[in-house]
């Protein structure tokens, strides 16, 4: 199982004066809970490494935001994170969509430095902990869940019973 997460693309305000440069923190927490399987591996197949070019507003993530997102993903139990792209392209429709390195293929971007810092930090933690192949018994014994269906949510959003309805706000 995997999901993609683009936190800063201009369509949400986040929290606080500069929240639009960090995104709404519940987006990662909800995705972790939604996609986490009872057994097996899951993670983020595409995590935004920097500015995108397809949003209504395309802000740079705040310094530290990419690293914050990575810690949030792993804190939710994910097993892996992949960045959307390694290198920012020279041309094309996503020419201004950042990668881990810039257009020259060598210069590390701010998001690339945050990936490197996170990798160093997670390696340091691995030396202080013992990996578990089996999930804890108390976790496996849980019997509570949120039943959610994207198609139902999309249908409700297109035909709201009132203009204030927000499915995600309801389940958060």
What are these regions (language model features)?
Residues 3-172:
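Carbohydrate-binding surfaces of carbohydrate-active enzymes
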